[in-house]
Amino acid sequence: MFISVPLPMLFPDFLKIDISDLTALLGGISLGPMAGITIAFLKNLLQFITGMSTTGGVGEFANFLIGGSFVFTVSYIYSKKRNIQGVIIGLVSGIVVMTVVGCIANYFIILPFYATIGWSIDAVVSMGAAINPAIDSKMSFIIWMIAPFNILKSGLMSLLTLPMYKKTEKILK
């Protein structure tokens, strides 16, 4: 999360748009899905071991798991259909996969991990409720914070990827 942007009026501060995920995405498109996953892993590991983590490694794990699902989906589909149509189908599919994986992972894994480093789930829900009064439980936090955040993040990554792909299309083929 070397180049990350919080959106404080829309989401709690620990949910950040991490533009550096583009590196893993472009690596996956150009070198294949496993390369993309490896880049995502190394990026998050480097973030953690350099002491830049503000979440005790939980945020990096979440970024790898959820962002990695996006990178893998896009790059796998592109590896089967190496043209602009493959990129678009991959990006749209990646948005869906990242949103679903993000919701499931946060409900069962990520939010409970935050509790192990001293953040109660109730405190996390309260952070969301301060922004959106419809949030009153872990499930409503997932529905009203996690799902929209992952749609926004993966949608933004998709919008940034398309012009980069067009500029590098000949090299990638």
Could you tell me what each predicted segment is?
Residues 1-173:
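Loop-helix junctions at membrane interfaces
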